Amino acid sequence: MLSLDLHPLFRNNRDIELALRQFVFRAHHSGEPVAEIIPGKGTGQLQSRVLAFLGQKHMRKLYDRAEVDPHNTGRILVHFSRR
């Protein structure tokens, strides 16, 4: 499973967006059914930013669904269809 840990980037908005964009494109093209993004638990602000980023129309076209892991709220699972 592909994974992106955002802990080292949490203070720089531009780096976070770039890392997310590159990661989603890489995961989309990899053929993996699921990829994980780890914003951590913290205050939930980073997780909200990640979900808002994933909800943008141009990003939404790349995956089927995204969800907060029900067993670990510090992790977001992004599901891709195998087209």
Positions of predicted regions on the chain:
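Long, charged, low-complexity intrinsically disordered regions
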Residues: 1-83
